[in-house]
């Protein structure tokens, strides 16, 4: 289903962004 795929892609994208932000947050030590 197109909508399901779209939602899954967005979810994966947001999780990826959150992971990157988390890594950056760790690197800054704050």
Curated annotation (Swiss-Prot):
One of its GO terms (cellular component) is extracellular region. GO terms for molecular function: glucagon receptor binding; hormone activity. GO terms for biological process: response to starvation. SMART domains: GLUCA. Its main location: secreted. InterPro entries: Glucagon, Glucagon_GIP_secretin_VIP. Coiled coil: none annotated. The modification Arginine amide is found at residue 30. Belongs to the glucagon family. PANTHER family: GLUCAGON, PRO-GLUCAGON. This is Glucagon-like peptide. It comes from Anguilla anguilla. The lineage of its organism: Eukaryota, Metazoa, Chordata, Craniata, Vertebrata.
């Amino acid at each position: 289903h197109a909508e399901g795929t779209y939602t899954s892609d967005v979810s994966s994208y947001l999780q990826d962004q959150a992971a990157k932000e988390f890594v950056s947050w760790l690197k800054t030590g704050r």
